[in-house]
Amino acid sequence: MSLITCEDLAFAYDGVTVLSHLNFKVEQGDYLCILGENGAGKSTLMKGLLGLKKPSAGNVAFGEDLRAKEIGYLPQQTPVQKDFPASVQEVVLSGCLSGMGMRPFYGKKEKARADRNMEALEITDLKDRCYRDLSGGQQQRVLLARALCATGKVILLDEPVAGLDPLVTINMYRLIERINKEMGITVIMVSHDMQAATKYASHILHLGEDRQLFFGTCEEYRHTAAFHTFMDGEKAVHIWKKAAGKEKKPRAANPEPETKREEQEKEVQQ
């Protein structure tokens, strides 16, 4: 049985349907990227998969060995969240809370899991630092480690590279790919980045006009009208930003980075 199966799924707000006729499956080991313009319903679908939004029609079915609370989630950060005054270790450990029941303290099992995930994401050297003092890329790694503490199966990522500079973005995409391929974690990611989606993902779900425009493999997607229309739109935005001087430029290398992670984030893809 598939990990997640959505059949004729629909969502509505105040009686107004915002998404309908969604039909797709997520298998173990998939890397699914959800694409679409702003307002296409991507975040609504994420809430539905997490059990935070009840469908107005259809059904979300989970495999026998998966429950909604076993899905790790990395949401987009708000300014308040970025200024959270806790240590990195405390933030990562909080990802274990959903599996602790009524137990009010972390045990050896949770601490070992947090240590493993911090090591896997190469942030062990940051464990005692305050979360709000970290760079944007470091904070995303911490939140990703937190999401992994909540699951060993599926993570949902809501635009995980939003606001990051180009070099840190490359490193983040590589890290997510490693989590998928080496750790065997199924990835479901919302993104506006068409090029990254078709490079790293195994499957694409394209939403638009309140419905599903495409679901299938990346190779199949490259031959659709939805792909070419969205790609042309991305190129137009890129040209406009470049002409207006609004594209982010890679930051100059820091001769004395505070940590090994900050130094690695500034490596240029060779």
PLM-predicted stretches and their roles:
Residues 108-126:
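Conserved ABC ATPase "signature" region
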Residues 130-134, 138:
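Conserved ABC ATPase signature
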Residues 155-158:
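Catalytic Walker B motif of ABC-type/P-loop ATPase nucleotide-binding domains
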Residues 166-168:
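Helix N-cap at the start of a conserved alpha-helix in ABC-type nucleotide-binding domains
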Residues 191-192:
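H-loop/switch region of ABC-family ATPase nucleotide-binding domains
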Residues 204-217:
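H-loop (His-switch) and adjacent beta-strand-loop-beta switch element
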Residues 219, 223-270:
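ABC ATPase nucleotide-binding domains
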